[in-house]
A protein has these predicted regions:
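Positively charged n-region of N-terminal signal peptides that target proteins for export
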Residues: 1-4
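Bacterial N-terminal signal peptides
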Residues: 6-17
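Basic, polyanion-binding surface patches
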Residues: 21-219
């Protein structure tokens, strides 16, 4: 009987020790994770250049990061009140280009100054501007790929801005940025993303895998 009690006690001590170690490990793991207050740190964020015309046909561009795919043929962008929203009120068509390492400085510039009080804003970018073939909006030729879009919906519209849902009418891509399969080659474009944590731009790197394919090895 004493031997049985001793065995039970040994098992309990062993289990307690294991549980204590497990709790210690969990505590240690938690200590390695620092908490931050809620903020706009969705990573990575795109660097979208929105092109519009005002009522007199003068081109404007702005830099936007809060945007993404809304549906197969639609995008959504969060817009504050800008010259861009003024333009879209009279001409609901736009282009959306993707900023690159080469266009970074001017792309940042159009996000810093407003077309409302900077008459020569576009001249300072040095960009080559043409009218888009399918919508009434400007195309900036220095960008490798541009979406031609039409406004479809404005969500939660107020004096401070709204969420813009736009239909993709057509996609333009410079031929020198096409891959062997004839489709846009993202690596060639040297696109940049916005780091909202440190307020920097980061160039996209190399391909590391095949989507909807590489994960099958874990099935």
């Amino acid at each position: 009987m004493k031997r049985l009690v001793a065995i039970v006690c040994l098992v309990m001590v062993t289990m307690s020790s294991a549980l204590a170690q497990q709790a210690k490990d969990v505590t240690n793991n938690k200590s390695n994770m620092k908490s931050f207050k809620s903020t706009a740190w969705l990573l990575p964020q795109p660097v979208l250049i929105i092109g519009t015309y005002d009522k007199e046909g003068k081109p404007n561009a702005m830099n936007a990061a809060w945007g993404g795919q809304w549906d197969m043929h639609e995008i959504i962008i969060s817009l504050g009140s800008h010259q861009t929203t003024d333009n879209l009120a009279v001409n609901p068509e736009l282009t959306v280009a993707f900023a690159t390492a080469e266009t970074m400085v001017a792309s940042d510039y159009v996000g810093i100054v407003s077309g409302r009080n900077t008459p020569d804003k576009m001249e300072k970018t040095g960009w080559t501007i043409e009218k888009a073939p399918n919508v009434n909006a400007p195309v900036f030729k220095e960008f490798p790929m541009t979406l031609e879009c039409r406004v479809k919906q404005k969500i939660d519209e107020s004096e401070t801005g709204y969420y813009l849902v736009a239909e993709i009418v057509n996609i333009l891509c410079d031929e020198k940025y096409l891959a062997e399969d004839g489709k846009p080659d993202v690596e060639k474009m040297k696109l940049i993303t916005f780091d909202p944590v440190h307020h920097t731009y980061i160039q996209l790197g190399k391909t590391v895998g095949k989507a909807f394919s590489d994960g099958k090895q874990l099935k």
